[in-house]
Structure formats: structure tokens, C-alpha cells
């Protein structure tokens, strides 16, 4: 009887302790996620500085506060005459665009700490990664019955699927992303572009015959679906045959055949993607995404962002339909005024141009923390960089990526994230990340 009484008291005590631990844990979690007056002030400061930055640097663009401290609208002058029409509705492009600064600072900061190249460890670590995801990165992958034959899927992806990340946050110093705009022919940026540590180009944009305008250095080339199908022609654009080719869509059998038979010796990888919704589109944004995930600073050329820009042009061929040019110009101005990029164009040709009223890093950091709380992001309010990990897997000891030979900012960042590879999880509620941690 005494034994039963003792067991009852022990169970009661244990239960109370568990409840207390739960309450304390929830309380601490609530405290770290609680939106404070300081958070509100951080968003106010960001929005005020952002308005001044757009006014000072936007060449006629103006920013106005939106419905709350996250929303802003970027407005074109009333005398702007849009030319681009929606191919489906036939409606002309608008002159005012609303953006969510909270979404932007939170998402782009996550990009800065992520690997944006698809790897085998990423697919392996995803819940049902081969059955639910891998086949989507293969052209006509739906015919593969959700990769029931895993070996076949591995074979189709093998030429573009590294085991671990080939590049790391902060791996490169100064980076330039070169668009294809016809405005590049108005200013001879070539020598300036060649001074960057890393240069990223897009699709089939040529270098030969345009070197004084676009430079000749080329480190990476980002390819859309059409360009990826013509890999054999793309590699001829790089005389030194050293470009790394980044494909933003899927792998095709014709691509695999060209890589094997041409042969194409340039590394070819598939990109992962952060989730920007409908905020911005196009190869240019993906190029900036990769650059921001691997570079200390990012400058952009050839995106045609000056007044009078109403349609897509190309420096090497006839104009094409493109998509929402005014929207693109507004989005890139938002990026510059969040300190993400620096724009170079015929009207901003001075390489020493100072972008005025860019928010400080401390302002951006405080606003990001506040934004993550409002957006209910995974790990919001925590100082731990791994708090955003919604999926955590251990890495095989024999598959650890080598970073010891890379520049100091890489090793510093690796210490900060405790040698963890962090990937965006596409379409993830709360924008959680997939994290591969070192083996014990």
C-alpha cells in the first residue's frame, strides 16, 4: 500500500513539473516572439528612411507609406506613358506598385544565409524528397511515377547534382550581375565590369564584339528554359570555357546528352528558389538571388532602370516582349533602397556614386527581427541563426564540404552557423529552412 502511495506522489510531482516546464517554455517562446514598441519603431525607421532613399535615388520615383508599417507603394511620375500590355488581358502596365518591406527584408536576409544550388543532400533530407520533389526538377518528370525507380531519377540528375553545396555564403567579394538591356550600349562599362571579383551573365548574351560595353570577364551564366536547351551554343559564348552554368528550371534529356557528347566541361547546376510570390519575376531576379547568396556586395548593370524605360530591349538583338518593365524597375529600386544592390545605368554611370539614405545594417537587422515576428516566421525573435531550421538532418561524416581554403568571410560565416548548410524550403509555411548539420 505504501508503495502505491509513493508511486502516486511521484507521478503527481512529475506531472506538475512537466506542466511547469511546459508553461515556462511557452512563456519564453512568447516573450521572444512578442511584438514590442522597439519593433514598431524599427519598422517606422525603415519605412521613413526608405521613402527618403527612393526620392533621392529613384530618378523621379516616389515612395509612399501604405496601409501599415510594412507596406509601401512606389509611384511613377504621372506623365509616364506605359507601353507594355498584359498579353492576356490587354491592359497597360500601371504606374504604382505596392511592396511589402517586411516580406522583403525577411526573405532576402534568408537568401543571404542560404545555399541556392540544388544538391543530393537536400533531396535526401526532404521528407519524401525523391517521391515528392526530385521528379519535379526533371523535364517530363511526371512520367517517372514520382521516382519509384529512384536509380533512374538519380541517373537523370547525376550530371547536375553535387552531393553538397559547391558555393557558400560570402564566398565572393564584389560581384556584378549583367542584364541584357539595350541601355548597355549607351555607356562603356566594360573595363569597370571586369574589375569585379565575380561576374554573372544571363542566357545567350554575347561578349564578343561588345567587350567595351559589357566587359569580357564571366564567372557564372544563369539560363532559363530556352537557353538551357541550347547548352552547346551557350558554352561557345565563353572563349575561356570557364563559366559555371546555372539552370533555373529543369534538367532535360537533351541537356544530359549535350553535357556527355559535346562534351560540355563547364560545371552545370540547377538552382533552388526562394519564395517571392508574385513580387518579381524573371531571370534577372534569379541571378540577383544567386549573387546575394554568395557575394559580399552585388552591383547590377544592364537592367534598364532609367526614366523613359517602357519596354524590354536587348543590346545584341531586336526588342522582345519581356514582362512588366515598370514593375521591374520599381522592384529593383526597392532592392537598392534596402541596401541589397547598387544600380549602374547611363544616368547613374559614376562608379563612385553614393546611394543616399540607405538604411544602416543595424536598422535593417532590427526591422528584419520585427518583420519575422509579424510574419510568424519560423524562429522569429531568436538570435540563434539555426532557429529558422524547420527540417534538420545530420550530414554523413564523409561528405563534409571543404571550406578551409576559402576566404575568411566564409569561415567566419561557417562559425556563425556552426558549419550548417542552410537551404530554402520552397513554398514552406513560415519560410522554414532545411538545415544539414555536421555529424557529431
From Swiss-Prot:
It is an enzyme of class 2 (transferase). Residues 1-5 are cytoplasmic. CDD domains: GT29. InterPro entries: Glyco_trans_29, GT29-like_sf. It is found in: Golgi apparatus membrane. Keywords: Glycoprotein, Glycosyltransferase, Golgi apparatus, Membrane, Signal-anchor, Transferase, Transmembrane, Transmembrane helix. Glycans are attached at residues 113, 149. It is a single-pass type II membrane protein. This is Sialyltransferase-like protein 2. It comes from Arabidopsis thaliana (Mouse-ear cress). GO terms for cellular component: endosome; Golgi apparatus; Golgi membrane; Golgi trans cisterna; trans-Golgi network. The keyword Cytoplasm does not apply. Belongs to the glycosyltransferase 29 family. Residues 27-440 are lumenal. The chain crosses the membrane at residues 6-26. The keyword Transferase applies. GO terms for biological process: pollen germination; pollen tube growth; protein glycosylation.
Amino acid at each position: 500500500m505504501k508503495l502505491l502511495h509513493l508511486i502516486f506522489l511521484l507521478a503527481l510531482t512529475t506531472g506538475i513539473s512537466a506542466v511547469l516546464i511546459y508553461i515556462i517554455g511557452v512563456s519564453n517562446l512568447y516573450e521572444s516572439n512578442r511584438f514590442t514598441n522597439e519593433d514598431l519603431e524599427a519598422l517606422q525607421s525603415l519605412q521613413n528612411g526608405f521613402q527618403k532613399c527612393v526620392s533621392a535615388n529613384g530618378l523621379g520615383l516616389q515612395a509612399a507609406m501604405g496601409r501599415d508599417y510594412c507596406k509601401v507603394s512606389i509611384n511613377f511620375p504621372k506623365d509616364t506613358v506605359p507601353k507594355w500590355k498584359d498579353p492576356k488581358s490587354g491592359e497597360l502596365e500601371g504606374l504604382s506598385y505596392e511592396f511589402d518591406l517586411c516580406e522583403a527584408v525577411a526573405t532576402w536576409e534568408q537568401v543571404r544565409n542560404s545555399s541556392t544550388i540544388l544538391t543530393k543532400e537536400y533531396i535526401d533530407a526532404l521528407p519524401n524528397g525523391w517521391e515528392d520533389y526530385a521528379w519535379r526538377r526533371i523535364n517530363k518528370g511526371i512520367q517517372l511515377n514520382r521516382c519509384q525507380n529512384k536509380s533512374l531519377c538519380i541517373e537523370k540528375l547525376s550530371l547536375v547534382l553535387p552531393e553538397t553545396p559547391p558555393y557558400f555564403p560570402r564566398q565572393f567579394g564584389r560581384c556584378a550581375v549583367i542584364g541584357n538591356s539595350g541601355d548597355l550600349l549607351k555607356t562603356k562599362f566594360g573595363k569597370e565590369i571586369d574589375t569585379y571579383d565575380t561576374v554573372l551573365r544571363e542566357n545567350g548574351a554575347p561578349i564578343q564584339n561588345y567587350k567595351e560595353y559589357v566587359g569580357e570577364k564571366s564567372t557564372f551564366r544563369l539560363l532559363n528554359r530556352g537557353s538551357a536547351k541550347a547548352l552547346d551554343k551557350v558554352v561557345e559564348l565563353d572563349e575561356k570555357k570557364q563559366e559555371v552554368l546555372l539552370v533555373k528550371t529543369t534538367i532535360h534529356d537533351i541537356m544530359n546528352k549535350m553535357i556527355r557528347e559535346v562534351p560540355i566541361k563547364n560545371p552545370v547546376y540547377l538552382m533552388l528558389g526562394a519564395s517571392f510570390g508574385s513580387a518579381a519575376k524573371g531571370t534577372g531576379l534569379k541571378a540577383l538571388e544567386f549573387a546575394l547568396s554568395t557575394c559580399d556586395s552585388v552591383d547590377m548593370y544592364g537592367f534598364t532602370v532609367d526614366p523613359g524605360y517602357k519596354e524590354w530591349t536587348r543590346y545584341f538583338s531586336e526588342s522582345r516582349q519581356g514582362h512588366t518593365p515598370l514593375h521591374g524597375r520599381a522592384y529593383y529600386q526597392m532592392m537598392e533602397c534596402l541596401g541589397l544592390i547598387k544600380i549602374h545605368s547611363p544616368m547613374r554611370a559614376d562608379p563612385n556614386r553614393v546611394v543616399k539614405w540607405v538604411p544602416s545594417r543595424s536598422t535593417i537587422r532590427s526591422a528584419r527581427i520585427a518583420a519575422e515576428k509579424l510574419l510568424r516566421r519560423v524562429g522569429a525573435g531568436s538570435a540563434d541563426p539555426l532557429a529558422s531550421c524547420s527540417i534538420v538532418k545530420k550530414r554523413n561524416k564523409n561528405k563534409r564540404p571543404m571550406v578551409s581554403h576559402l576566404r575568411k568571410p566564409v569561415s567566419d560565416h561557417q562559425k556563425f552557423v556552426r558549419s550548417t548548410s542552410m537551404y530554402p524550403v520552397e513554398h514552406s509555411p513560415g519560410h522554414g529552412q532545411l538545415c544539414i548539420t555536421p555529424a557529431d
